[in-house]
From Swiss-Prot:
It is found in: Periplasm. Residues 1-26 form the signal peptide. InterPro entries: HdeA, HdeA/HdeB_sf, HdeA_sf, HNS-dep_expression_A/B. Required for optimal acid stress protection. Exhibits a chaperone-like activity only at low pH by suppressing non-specifically the aggregation of denaturated periplasmic proteins. The gene is hdeA. Belongs to the HdeA family. The keyword Repeat does not apply. This is Probable acid stress chaperone HdeA. The keyword Lipid metabolism does not apply. Its main location: periplasm. Pfam families: HdeA. Disulfide bonds join C46-C94. GO terms for biological process: cellular stress response to acidic pH.
Length: 114
């Protein structure tokens, strides 16, 4: 298996590139995503996550799941069922507290599933 070679900042860059590669967006959405691109993953808020397109949120959660595994080679798999289970919980937790740390909310929900 491939060892995880990315750090949290690399993950953020990849997530941001994917988020910004979508079609035309409203100017405020562009500004929001541009601001998000300047943040480290640990600095993202639930509000940042809430601003993403719904269809992209599972991708972001997938990155979080991967990095939460702490780079262990034996854990370097994509758990689609787990991601599908935890994504709605993270979305709901972030709706409840938009100013909260996205990373901390995601970690709390991941502990319940993984």
């Amino acid at each position: 298996m491939i060892k995880a070679l990315f750090n949290k900042n690399t993950a953020l860059a990849a997530v941001t590139i994917l988020a910004l590669s979508g079609g035309a967006m409203a100017e405020s959405a562009k500004t929001h995503k541009t601001d998000m691109a300047k943040k480290k993953v640990s600095e993202l808020t639930c509000e940042d996550f809430n601003g993403l397109e719904e269809s992209f949120k599972p991708t972001v959660v997938g990155w979080v799941v991967g990095f939460n595994k702490k780079g262990k080679e034996e854990d370097a798999v994509i758990d689609v069922d787990g991601i599908e289970t935890v994504t709605p919980a993270i979305i709901e937790a972030c709706k409840q507290e938009p100013k909260a740390s996205f990373w901390k909310k995601a970690e709390a929900e991941l502990k319940k599933v993984f």
